[in-house]
Amino acid sequence: MPLIPKQAVGAKIVGWGTALPEKIITNDDLSKTMDTSDAWIRERTGIERRHVGGSTASLSIESGRKAIEMAGIDPLSIDALVLSTTTPDRTVPATSAAVQHGLGLR
C-alpha cells in the first residue's frame, strides 16, 4: 500500500529564475579603501568580485517573475511561497509578504 494516496498532488519545480544586483565591487575597488589586495583576497577566499545593492524582496521578485515566465503558469495558480534568507529587508512584515504581493500571488 503506498504511503501517499494516488489522488495526492506533490510539489514540483517547473521554473526557476536568478537575479543579481547590478553594482559590482571588485577586489581592486576594495584595495583602494582597505589595506588589502586582489591577490590576498583571491588566495584566501577565491572571491574576485561581489554584486552589492538591491533588497532581498526586489531580487526575489525579479527571479520569481523569471521562474513564473519560464514555467508558463498563472501566478494565482501557485499554492505556496517559500523564502529563506539570512538577510531579510526587515523583521516585520516578513520579506515573503512583500514578495507574495510583488508577484501577484494569493
Regions found by a protein language model. Name each.
Residues 1-79:
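Conserved active-site "lid/cap" helical segment
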Residues 82:
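N-terminal Rossmann-like NAD(P) cofactor-binding module of classical short-chain dehydrogenase/reductase
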